[in-house]
From Swiss-Prot:
It comes from Ajellomyces capsulatus. This is Tubulin beta chain. One of its GO terms (cellular component) is microtubule. It comes from the Eukaryota. Tubulin is the major constituent of microtubules, a cylinder consisting of laterally associated linear protofilaments composed of alpha- and beta-tubulin heterodimers. Microtubules grow by the addition of GTP-tubulin dimers to the microtubule end, where a stabilizing cap forms. Below the cap, tubulin dimers are in GDP-bound state, owing to GTPase activity of alpha-tubulin. Keywords: Cytoplasm, Cytoskeleton, GTP-binding, Magnesium, Metal-binding, Microtubule, Nucleotide-binding. InterPro entries: Beta-tubulin_BS (IPR013838), Beta_tubulin (IPR002453), Tub_FtsZ_C (IPR008280), Tubulin (IPR000217), Tubulin/FtsZ-like_C (IPR037103), Tubulin/FtsZ_2-layer-sand-dom (IPR018316), Tubulin/FtsZ_GTPase_sf (IPR036525), Tubulin_C (IPR023123). One of its GO terms (molecular function) is metal ion binding. Mg(2+) binds at E69. Its cofactor is Mg(2+). It is found in: Cytoplasm, Cytoskeleton. Its main location: cytoplasm.
Length: 445
C-alpha cells in the first residue's frame, strides 16, 4: 500500500488534526478505540494509507503529534478519539515558543526536533511503501510555523524522494489574530514552504470566520466550528488517497496534475454544501448546484476572488451517488461559461474524480482544489503587513535575540515578492510563451 505519515504541530495543527482524524475514522468505520465496526468493503480497501493495523485488529493512525507545550496534547488525549493514537507518538516539552518563529525554528524547536524525527522514522519503517508526508500547522504562531517548517526541512533531508503535502493556516487575520508578530511568522514560514513543500493547501482564518457567520449564521464561531470546516475540506481532499479510484490516487499524481511549475504549489480549497457542526443537510443537493458552488468565492477557504486571477489547474472530487456523465456535462458547462478565467496554454486543466462514499450526514458533496494565480493577493496581504513592521524594525529584537539575522527577514520578503511576480507572470502569459515553459518543465519531470 502507498502509506502517508501524518504530522500535526502546534496548537492549531493539533486541534485541526484531532478533528481530521475524528472525521476520517468515522468515514472508514473505525470507532474511538480503533476497532472497525463498518459494513462496507470499500472502507477497508485502502485503510492502510492512513492507519496501521496493530494487534487484535486495532487500527492506529500513522500520526505524530508535536507541540512545545502540553496543553493541547492533554486536550487531544482527553477528546473522544484520544485513545486512537499511539502513546509514544505524542512528542512535547514544557517550554512553549511564545508565538515567536525563531524559538520554534532555532532554539526550543531545534532541541526537540531529533526526538520527533526518531518517531517519524519509526512510523516510516512500519510502512511497506511510503508515498510521503502530510503536515498540519498554522503559519502565524511559534510552534506550528517555526518548528513545523523546521520539521519539513529535516524530513526533506532524510526522505528526499518522498512527497510533502502541507495543510497550512496561511494568512494572519485581524479577526482571529492572537499575536502582533503573525506577519513575520507567516512570511518566514512561506519562505520555507516555497522551497520544501510539494503541495500546500492554503486555509485562511478570515474566510473560515466569514463562512461561519454569513453562510452558517453562527453569531460567535468557536475554534471548534472553524476546525469542523477544515476537517471537512481535508476529508474531501484526501478522499482519492483513502478510497479506490483512478484520479489523483496518490500525492505524486496529485502534484503532477496540479503543479505546472515547482514553486507554484499553493492551492485554494473549497467545499459544498457547507453545514455547521452536528447539523445535517436536509435539503436535496444536485450536481448542477455543487458545480456552481465550486466557482463561488463564498465556498472557498481563502478570502480571495478567483475573478482577479486565472486558473492554472483545478481538480474536483464529487462524493455520493452521482452520475459520471452528469458531472462531466456540468463541469464542461461551467468551464465553457468561465473559460476566460482558465489559462489556455494548459489544455485539459480541470480534473474530476468520483467516490461513492459521501461524508457523514450528507447525501452528496464536492471538494475542489484550485491552483489559481489569484492566490498572489493572499501573499500580498501578508507581505504588506510584514513590510510595514519590518521597515521600522518593530519587534525584531524577539527574533534577533534567538540568534536570527536581519538578512533572513530580507530574504524571506524578497522570496515572497518573487512568488507574487511569478504568479502574475503566468497570469499574463499568452499561449505561445506559456506553452514553451510548461512543456520544458513537463519534459524535465
Amino acid at each position: 500500500m502507498r502509506e502517508i505519515v501524518h504530522l500535526q504541530t502546534g496548537q492549531c495543527g493539533n486541534q485541526i488534526g484531532a478533528a481530521f482524524w475524528q472525521t476520517i475514522s468515522g468515514e472508514h468505520g473505525v470507532d474511538g478505540a480503533g476497532y472497525y465496526n463498518g459494513s462496507l468493503d470499500i472502507q477497508l480497501e485502502r485503510m492502510n494509507v492512513y492507519f496501521n493495523e496493530a494487534a487484535e485488529k486495532k487500527y492506529v493512525p500513522r500520526a505524530v503529534l508535536v507541540d512545545l507545550e502540553p496543553g493541547t496534547m492533554d486536550s487531544v488525549r482527553a477528546g473522544p478519539f484520544g485513545q486512537l493514537f499511539r502513546p509514544d507518538n505524542f512528542v512535547f516539552v514544557q517550554s512553549g515558543a511564545g508565538n515567536t518563529w525563531a524559538k520554534g525554528h532555532y532554539t526550543e524547536g531545534s532541541e526537540l526536533v531529533d526526538q520527533v524525527i526518531d518517531v517519524v522514522r519509526r512510523e516510516a519503517e512500519r510502512c511497506d511503501c511510503l508515498q510521503g508526508f502530510q503536515i498540519i500547522h498554522s503559519l502565524g504562531g511559534g510552534t506550528g510555523a517555526g518548528m513545523g517548517t523546521l520539521l519539513i526541512s529535516k524530513i526533506r533531508e532524510e526522505f528526499p524522494d518522498r512527497m510533502m503535502a502541507t495543510f497550512s493556516s496561511v494568512v494572519p487575520s485581524p479577526k482571529v489574530s492572537d499575536t502582533v508578530v503573525e506577519p513575520y511568522n507567516a512570511t518566514l514560514s512561506n519562505h520555507q514552504l516555497v522551497e520544501n513543500s510539494d503541495e500546500t493547501f492554503c486555509i485562511d482564518n478570515e474566510a473560515l470566520y466569514d463562512i461561519c457567520m454569513r453562510t452558517l449564521k453562527l453569531s460567535e464561531p468557536s475554534y471548534g466550528d472553524l476546525n469542523h470546516l477544515v476537517s471537512a475540506v481535508m476529508s474531501g481532499v484526501t478522499t482519492c488517497l483513502r478510497f479506490p479510484g483512478q484520479l489523483n490516487s496518490d500525492l505524486r499524481k496529485l502534484a503532477v496534475n496540479m503543479v505546472p511549475f515547482p514553486r507554484l504549489h499553493f492551492f485554494m480549497v473549497g467545499f459544498a454544501p457547507l453545514t455547521s457542526r452536528g447539523a445535517y443537510s436536509f435539503r436535496v443537493v444536485t450536481v448542477p448546484e455543487l458545480t456552481q458552488k465550486m466557482y463561488d468565492p463564498k465556498n472557498m477557504m481563502c478570502l480571495l476572488d478567483f475573478r482577479n486571477g486565472r486558473y492554472l489547474t483545478a481538480s474536483a472530487i464529487f462524493r455520493g451517488k452521482v452520475s459520471m456523465k452528469e458531472v462531466e456535462d456540468q463541469m464542461r458547462n461551467v468551464q465553457n461559461k468561465n473559460h476566460t478565467y482558465f489559462v489556455e496554454w494548459i489544455p485539459n486543466n480541470v480534473q474530476t474524480a468520483l467516490c461513492s462514499i459521501p461524508p457523514r450526514g450528507l447525501k452528496m458533496s464536492s471538494t475542489f482544489v484550485e491552483n489559481s494565480t489569484a492566490i498572489q493577493e493572499l501573499f500580498k496581504r501578508v507581505g504588506d503587513q510584514f513590510t510595514a513592521m519590518f521597515r521600522r524594525k518593530a519587534f525584531l529584537h524577539w527574533y534577533t535575540g534567538e540568534g536570527m539575522d536581519e538578512m533572513e527577514f530580507t530574504e524571506a520578503e524578497s522570496n515572497m515578492n518573487d512568488l507574487v511576480s511569478e504568479y502574475q507572470q503566468y497570469q499574463d502569459a499568452s499561449i505561445s510563451e506559456g506553452e514553451d515553459e510548461y512543456f520544458d518543465y513537463a519534459w524535465a519531470m
